[in-house]
Amino acid sequence: MKTVFIHPERCIGCKQCEAACAVAHSQSKNLFLAVFEVPTPKPRIHAEQGLVLNTAFPNKCRHCLPAPCQAVCPTAAIYRPMDFPEIVQIHPKKCIACGMCAMVCPFDVITFYASVQAPDKSSVATKCDHCIERQRQGQIPACVEACKVGALQFGEINELVKSARTRYSEMVSVSLAQVSAEILRQPDNVEAWHRQGAAISRMNADEKKGV
């Protein structure tokens, strides 16, 4: 099963994933034309700001199995396509915007936006669909393609988990001083961004204390 794997420690909150997602789900598939579309295309991934400046978490649908949203939908608008049964999709024409799916979603990733596919372009439940149309064309999800720091990866879930597990094992080795900490360094641009955010956060905290 393929999925989008998130490395929150690498996210710098640049929101490139959000922009790419919105464009991928626009009518024109073009950044410069998408901003003039009605309704304006919206992202299905949300890079939320963390507690410390310059830290963020790219939150998106996890495509749960079983999916609580699918179970409570009274109109069967939420379903799994035959060719990609691991993906949970929403049919805009069947959605009545009752909000039940958003209420039961444990990750708060279902939002309501106007859709060109909905009757009268009304607001309907909207969430990540793993860029199913792109996958059908042999492409990876737009958010993964846009991420420049490796915070989002796409692939077989077991392989991605194994890679992450190996990394955590290396972290334990570093803590025991068995290997150099250099192997665990984040990309220079990520570390610099996080250091800047931490420094500004400390300055703001000192200012509040009157230091």
Outline where the language-model segments fall.
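Ferredoxin-type iron-sulfur electron-transfer modules and their immediate structural context
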Residues: M1-A77, P81, E86, K94, ...
